[in-house]
């Protein structure tokens, strides 16, 4: 959908906060757009504040499209409504299209900003079933925007852009009359599970590594970590794959993202980290 959006609107310059999902830049590059990377401050947990908002507004000259995320990937923080409203007001006056990626919004238990498309004609909200319903192999998502924008984007998609399998799974997800299935209960249980397991991981990681590791606040189903310990290699040796965030603009080799999974998988991760610490292997590679 991000590629279709960019092809439909053909912006000459695209604004992207850093760090953020690499798919935004990839989409912009498909039409040869200039990418304006707007760095967020680590000391503010890579979150937007009023000072950052004012700085961002000063960098909007020439930008035709701005990518935002709520919550953001790979950090997991949400955008405050007052700050987003201020930014959207500025973008609306300048006729800048804002793409708000809410693919992880369901994990927060909040409604997000879909209703704002009525107020802001240049706002596009993108969402996905893939994340919250744990169907990564089924590429199924959607966007909401003003009718004229939706029509432009639809013309950039293949005529048959959703497979029969994806259609069927999507229909079943929305069908609360299926025996043994309640979408509302599933969402409630999933949000509670992720929240409990996230707190478990944060507690255990702090207990193991203390000030050797920074854990950034997250409202999504993942945690961004910063440590000089080469976690990626040490965990890979134990059959556990985490996200090395070295290739994210605005991050570096000390950053990693871990998924918040079910309790058995999270315990397996913690046990592997305890083993690394016990054997002193965090020093084996030195600083990466």
Report the location of each language-model feature.
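Conserved PLP-binding catalytic core of the aspartate aminotransferase-like
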Residues: 195, 199, 206-239
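Conserved beta-loop-alpha segment that forms the PLP phosphate-binding cup at the N-terminus of a helix
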Residues: 1-12, 141
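Active-site phosphate-binding strand-loop segment of PLP-dependent enzymes
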Residues: 44-106
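PLP-dependent aminotransferase-like
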Residues: 7-68
């Amino acid at each position: 959908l991000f590629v279709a959006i960019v092809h439909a609107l053909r912006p000459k310059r695209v604004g992207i906060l850093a760090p953020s999902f690499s798919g935004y830049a990839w989409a912009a590059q498909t039409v040869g757009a200039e990418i304006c990377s707007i760095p967020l401050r680590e000391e503010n947990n890579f979150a937007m504040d009023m000072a950052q908002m004012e700085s961002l507004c000063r960098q909007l000259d020439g930008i035709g499209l701005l990518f935002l995320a709520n919550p953001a990937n790979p950090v997991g923080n949400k955008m405050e409504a007052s700050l987003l409203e201020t930014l959207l007001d500025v973008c609306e006056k300048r006729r800048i299209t804002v793409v708000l990626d809410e693919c992880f919004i369901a994990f927060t238990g909040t409604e997000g900003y879909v209703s704002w498309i009525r107020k802001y004609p240049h706002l596009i909200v993108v969402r996905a079933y893939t994340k919250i319903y744990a169907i990564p192999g089924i590429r199924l998502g959607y966007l909401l925007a003003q009718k004229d924008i939706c029509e432009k984007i639809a013309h950039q998609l293949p005529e048959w852009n959703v497979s029969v399998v994806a259609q069927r799974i999507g229909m079943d997800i929305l069908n609360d009359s299926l025996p043994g299935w309640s979408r509302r209960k599933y969402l409630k249980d999933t949000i509670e599970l992720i929240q409990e397991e996230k707190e478990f991981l944060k507690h255990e990681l702090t207990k193991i590594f203390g000030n050797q590791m920074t854990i950034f606040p997250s409202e999504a189903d993942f945690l961004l970590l910063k440590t000089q310990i080469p976690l990626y290699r040490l965990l890979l040796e134990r059959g556990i794959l985490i996200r090395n965030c070295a290739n994210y603009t605005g991050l570096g080799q000390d950053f990693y993202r871990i998924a918040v999974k079910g309790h058995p998988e999270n315990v397996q991760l913690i046990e592997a980290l305890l083993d690394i610490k016990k054997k002193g292997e965090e020093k084996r590679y030195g600083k990466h």
